[in-house]
Amino acid sequence: MMTYEGKLIAEGLKFGIVAARFNEFITNKLVGGALDALLRHGVAESDIEIAWVPGAFEIPLVAQKMAETKKYDAIICLGAVIRGATPHFDFVSAEVSKGVAHVGLETKLPVVFGVLTTDTIEQAIERAGTKAGNKGFDSAITAIETVNLLKMIQ
């Protein structure tokens, strides 16, 4: 029986990050966490590019454009969608998650969903580097591992 498991080896890999400016207080912390993880695992700063988009809804389109350039080994998508008093949260959350998944399947490239979808600002803060860790860091680790896993399976 063959078992595959991705390694956390990132030297020489290139990463694109798509980050939403909306809820920038949160997203900046997610980007910081992602950069920390990538740099700790040997990615050169020159091998990381960040595209800032207005809001989470724009993430899938820009992620697809970045993936299509074939410059990156993975794309990390970061943002924060926080529930409000209207159904807007439900529409945005659903479309962003579907869009990010679609880009990965279409381009055969790891496209990691690191968009927080929380009920409160407090929950978002907890997931951006306090009580619940940093989901930006976690997303970068997922990207590294998935890149290496796909290389093993080919």
UniProtKB/Swiss-Prot annotation:
One GO MF term on file is: 6,7-dimethyl-8-ribityllumazine synthase activity
Enzyme Commission number, as recorded = 2.5.1.78
**Would the keyword Thylakoid be found if you checked this record's keyword annotation?**
no
User: Which keywords does the record carry?
Assistant: Riboflavin biosynthesis, Transferase
Domain of life of the organism encoding this protein: Bacteria
A single GO BP annotation from the record?
riboflavin biosynthetic process
Catalytic residues (UniProt): H88
Enumerate the catalysed reactions: (2S)-2-hydroxy-3-oxobutyl phosphate + 5-amino-6-(D-ribitylamino)uracil = 6,7-dimethyl-8-(1-D-ribityl)lumazine + phosphate + 2 H2O + H(+)
> Which pathway is this protein assigned to?
Cofactor biosynthesis; riboflavin biosynthesis; riboflavin from 2-hydroxy-3-oxobutyl phosphate and 5-amino-6-(D-ribitylamino)uracil: step 1/2
Cellular component, GO annotation: cytosol; riboflavin synthase complex
Q: Which residues bind (2S)-2-hydroxy-3-oxobutyl phosphate?
A: A85, T86, R127
**What positions does the entry give for 5-amino-6-(D-ribitylamino)uracil binding?**
F22, A56, F57, E58, A80, V81, I82, F113
Listed InterPro entries = LS, LS/RS, LS/RS_sf
Which residue windows are coiled coil?
Answer: none
Uppermost EC category: transferase
Q: What family is this? A: Belongs to the DMRL synthase family.
Kindly give the HAMAP family that the UniProt entry links to this protein. Answer: Lumazine_synth
PANTHER family from the UniProt entry: 6,7-DIMETHYL-8-RIBITYLLUMAZINE SYNTHASE, 6,7-DIMETHYL-8-RIBITYLLUMAZINE SYNTHASE DMRL SYNTHASE LUMAZINE SYNTHASE
* Purpose of the protein: Catalyzes the formation of 6,7-dimethyl-8-ribityllumazine by condensation of 5-amino-6-(D-ribitylamino)uracil with 3,4-dihydroxy-2-butanone 4-phosphate. This is the penultimate step in the biosynthesis of riboflavin.
Tell me the protein's name.
Answer: 6,7-dimethyl-8-ribityllumazine synthase
Q: Which gene encodes it?
A: ribH
